[in-house]
């Protein structure tokens, strides 16, 4: 009987920790930009009320779609806003990400008339200017692995450029798909490593501007991080990422306690798993 009670407690612990891991992975904050040049608004004004309404609506709508845009107010009190979740995340993850983003953008850009916030799974933006169909690549943010591509990955730079160029062209044909402009491709090279390529544009861009946005984002990403295991750039209108970190040819994972490294997204899962395993044996007295 005592053992059964202990197992029940451990199961509750496991599911709680697993939920925390999932939320942590999906809600990784990348950057927040509060645009000072657009001016400020005063609290308790009509613009402030319209902004609060817009952010609340975006948060609610993220339960039903991976993309949504909205305009509230009239004249100088008009606020335009949108959110975009990465095409492969589910609605639960999208909603959690957008909910956090709307809270944080309001908290960190308290009186700014324009701001944008990026997470790994989503972005949220608002402005007093209409921006939906405009091509923009700034402000952007990128993250990358701390570990370089192994020397055995022959001609990686050229292969990355060629493959991403192909994926960008294919994605421009997906303007009317269920998830517009989103495309993920996995290609194996030399039976040695897999290259996962992901691109996505804001649905309001036309195919030409989507292609241009992705090419400019790729150019910036390869210049900064083209020799890393993985890299990811998020711009106001598109995103580009590549990943080889799941390749079977890579050496064993480094110790999870290594701080300050983003080499492998998900190291925390390994650490939590180890802690949970130790807890099980200790709790049961094994």
UniProtKB/Swiss-Prot annotation:
GO terms for cellular component: membrane. The lineage of its organism: Eukaryota, Viridiplantae, Streptophyta, Embryophyta, Tracheophyta. InterPro entries: GNK2 (IPR002902), GNK2_sf (IPR038408). The keyword Membrane applies. Residues 21-265 are extracellular. The keyword Secreted does not apply. This is Cysteine-rich repeat secretory protein 57. It holds the Pfam family Stress-antifung. It comes from Arabidopsis thaliana. It comes from the Eukaryota. It is found in: Membrane. CDD domains: Gnk2-like. Keywords: Glycoprotein, Membrane, Repeat, Signal, Transmembrane, Transmembrane helix. Residues 29-131, 137-247 form the Gnk2-homologous domain. It is a single-pass type I membrane protein. The chain crosses the membrane at residues 266-284.
């Amino acid at each position: 009987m005592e053992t059964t009670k202990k197992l029940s407690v451990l199961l509750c612990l496991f599911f709680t920790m697993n939920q925390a891991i999932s939320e942590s992975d999906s809600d990784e904050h990348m950057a927040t930009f509060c645009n000072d040049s657009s001016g400020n608004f005063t609290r308790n004004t009509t613009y402030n009320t319209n902004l609060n309404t817009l952010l609340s609506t975006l948060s609610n709508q993220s339960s039903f779609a991976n993309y949504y845009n909205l305009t509230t107010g009239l004249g100088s009190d008009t606020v335009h806003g949108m959110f975009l979740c990465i095409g492969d995340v589910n609605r639960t993850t999208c909603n959690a990400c957008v909910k956090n983003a709307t809270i944080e953008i309001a908290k960190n850009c308290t009186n700014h008339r324009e701001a944008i916030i990026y997470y790994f799974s989503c972005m949220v933006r608002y402005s007093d200017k209409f921006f939906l169909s405009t091509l923009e690549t700034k402000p952007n943010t990128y993250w990358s692995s701390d570990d370089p591509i192994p020397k055995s990955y022959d001609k990686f730079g050229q292969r990355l450029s060629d493959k991403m160029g192909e994926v960008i062209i294919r994605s421009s044909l997906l303007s009317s798909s269920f998830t517009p402009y989103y495309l993920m491709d996995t290609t194996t090279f030399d039976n040695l490593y897999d290259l996962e390529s992901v691109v996505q544009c804001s649905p309001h861009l036309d195919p030409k501007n989507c292609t241009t946005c992705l090419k400019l984002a790729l150019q910036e990403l390869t210049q900064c991080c083209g020799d890393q295991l993985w890299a990811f750039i998020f711009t106001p209108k598109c995103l580009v990422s590549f990943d080889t970190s799941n390749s079977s040819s890579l050496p064993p994972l480094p110790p999870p306690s290594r701080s300050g490294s983003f080499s492998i997204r998900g190291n925390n899962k390994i650490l939590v798993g180890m802690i949970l395993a130790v807890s099980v044996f200790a709790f049961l007295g094994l």
